[in-house]
Amino acid sequence: MFENTETNGPVNCSFCGKSQDQVKKIVAGPGVYICNECIDLCKEIIDEEFSEEQTHELTDIPTPKEIVDELDQYVIGQNEAKRTLSVAVYNHYKRVKAMADNDEETEDGPELQKSNISLVGPTGSGKTFLAQSLARILDVPFAIADATTLTEAGYVGEDVENILLKLLQNADYDVERAEKGIIYIDEIDKIAKKSENVSITRDVSGEGVQQALLKILEGTIANVPPQGGRKHPQQEFIQIDTTNILFIVGGAFDGIEDIVKRRLGDKTIGFGTDTDGKNAVLDDSKSLMQQVVPEDLLQFGLIPEFIGRLPILTALERLTEDDLVRILTEPKNALVKQYQRLIALDGAELDFNDDALRAIAQEALARNTGARGLRSIIEDTMRDIMYDIPSREDVKKVIITRETVADHAEPELVLADQKAS
């Protein structure tokens, strides 16, 4: 037992070497001494490590409404998708927290299975950004994977376990934190079977990849090579439990509207058809994309087992011109605000008039790139301006017009001794 002892000879701390005269207390043990300063330092180290461990715990999970409110600050439109995602994510992390707390209901009641998510929507509708925003709101590690780079074991390409490696890297190789992260797999529609007919040849990047993903989607102990690449027997692995990792898959699923149209059309053929048109394709209350069901994904080429591990399905609408204009100006990190900040650092103001914003949105629609293409259009418009402004101390304000966007005309400049008209 350690105690504060009086000794006849000089006593020094066994850790820092300070004498009894240099510190307030020295605690003695069998053949060892420690001073009060070293005790305080040890306590700080232990408290710091304990606090780092505590950060892995999910304490205050935001409610679905709080998640949507946060998403609304960054994501324009897609209200139905935001509500669906907020409920799904809330239930997922509520389940994770219950399992971590060893809740009695978890032990005695029904097992809470995880619900991964499918996002269906055109290019540039915000699928990736929604997934990224959810991870930021929940403060969990996040990784993006491209399904087209994956192949099944034995073929040239990436193993599916490399998806987990990206998540682990983004969690600073903290396995426990990575096991509560979110993985978004993009271009999932590109690994659909090419046809419903069974082929003699192997579908290396299609059904085989879907089969390879099944285990990690459902929950398994995966062996992840720390350096990535292909696995081999002599290699060391990091084991990751995917049970509590939320998987969100997304794809444009080009042509799925035709599948929905055929399905809805079949329902309106024959006796007993609804004459009021409630089941008709042209029902304005919902777009074709909003009426996608798992059966349509099956027809598209995803296998039943894969669809079954993605029980939550939500669709994103194609963004309209009005949506794109709002995306340019309203979110906290809106592109217009970003470029205004950049120009302000050079001592000038930047203004996009309404016609200019409309022209940018129309160009994005013409390119069929959705919100994803907005930055490149603005960058193309602003390149010469950002080249000249740092050298022009006389410029007070830059006004971007429709002609600046559409025809690469010179912007309107307000000089220091002028006033805007």
Swiss-Prot record:
Residues 1-54 form the ClpX-type ZB domain. GO terms for cellular component: HslUV protease complex. Keywords: ATP-binding, Chaperone, Metal-binding, Nucleotide-binding, Zinc. The keyword Calcium does not apply. Transmembrane segments: none annotated. ATP binds at P122, T123, G124, S125, G126, K127, T128, F129. GO terms for biological process: cell division; proteolysis involved in protein catabolic process. Gene3D superfamilies: 1.10.8.60, ClpX chaperone, C4-type zinc finger domain (6.20.220.10), P-loop containing nucleotide triphosphate hydrolases (3.40.50.300). One of its GO terms (molecular function) is ATP binding. Component of the ClpX-ClpP complex. Forms a hexameric ring that, in the presence of ATP, binds to fourteen ClpP subunits assembled into a disk-like structure with a central cavity, resembling the structure of eukaryotic proteasomes. This is ATP-dependent Clp protease ATP-binding subunit ClpX. It comes from Lactiplantibacillus plantarum (strain ATCC BAA-793 / NCIMB 8826 / WCFS1) (Lactobacillus plantarum). The lineage of its organism: Bacteria, Bacillati, Bacillota, Bacilli, Lactobacillales.
